[in-house]
Amino acid sequence: MNYRKTLIACYLGFVTQAITANFAPLLFLTFHNVYNIPLGKIALISSVFFITQLIVDILCAKFADRIGYRRCVVGSQLFSAAGLLGLAFLPQIMPDPFMGIIISTIVYAVGSGLTEVLVSPIVESCPFEHKEAAMSLLHSFYCWGSVGVILLSTVLFS
């Protein structure tokens, strides 16, 4: 059986995780200037992201075996996409833009938490000849995703 597509999907999952973790902080000054959100409240966005991710990490360990790893990983990408889409629209349509940002953050943090907990064990369980290399490359994709989102954002924001 060929696990190449599984490996590529896992690599892309870590890129998605990097986007969810790094995109909103690049917008903090935009949130402050456009929506007049105080910087003290903006600092809560990262806290909400990581607390949500931690809660998902804890809960995921209990439920992934019952629900299934594939469903959970596909769900992680759907949550991440929905949260990022929400970040584009919810602050503009909700009466309180900050609540739109927080709701979006919680949604994409769920996806990020699922990715964090599930992707490494999936790659580890695949019968690759050079598993150590696959795992090293997997974790480098988070870095590449971070670099990509920062470079692309820099180009688009300038």
Residue ranges and their predicted role:
Residues 78-95:
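C-terminal ends and interior cores of transmembrane alpha-helices
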Residues 131-153:
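Glycine-rich segments within core transmembrane alpha-helices of 12-TM secondary carriers
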